[in-house]
């Protein structure tokens, strides 16, 4: 219902004309890592140029086809099923970068699935359950020990700086991936060249002339080629929908009506057939805590103060 609630709100904006006009909801475009920097990067090209040419579908595509149509990612919620069943094809190894086993449904079953893999490489900043089930564990850098490129909606870009030197022999995820690509001699020269060169390529449409000066600069800088969005552009170019219109009845969802999905954003009652008078409470295992991110920061004093007592949600 969260998905349909979002769709309903968007539909009301369309019906009342409060979309893609000055002072209304405006479409959002992604520059890098789901952030809008006001310019089109080469992030998709960076991936597509070396995308494996295979007929193997991503994990979860058959079970979650709408997700697969909308998001260029596998669906991890189906990972354990594929490992255990070997269908539609077997999985033999896993690279677990900061994987939190508690995020997955039926955690014990997920861990059992991991144990069936022939090899697991894991990295993390803590000795987690995933690390305990790995064959090789690499220490990862915290955000305090590494740099990264970030872009912002204000048309700025920033090359962050580490605030402390690396503690012991840890490395950040991107460096681990790039160095593994070199060690395995993958056919991807750009990836083998390292994180900095990759980001220089991805962000090149932004028009930054002196990348070294940008990397050395303390704080964000304006992106030369970034431009503010002009209201009305999206509607003028035509919505990227099957009908080319703003759809209240989603044709993309309609393809999967046999999966129980409704093209209209309607409320779906619980599948539980219990009598609400006799059983007035609903047990929810997916509730979000405002003071934590999954299993993170539970032991930090200031967010813990927002929720001092343990409870059952």
Segments from the language model and where they lie:
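A generic secondary-structure signal for well-formed alpha-helical elements
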Residues: 16-23, 134, 141, 184-188
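A glycine-rich phosphate-binding loop feature that marks nucleotide/adenosyl-phosphate handling sites
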Residues: 25-36, 193-207
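A cross-kingdom feature strongest in bacterial/archaeal respiratory oxidoreductases
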Residues: 57-169, 201-313
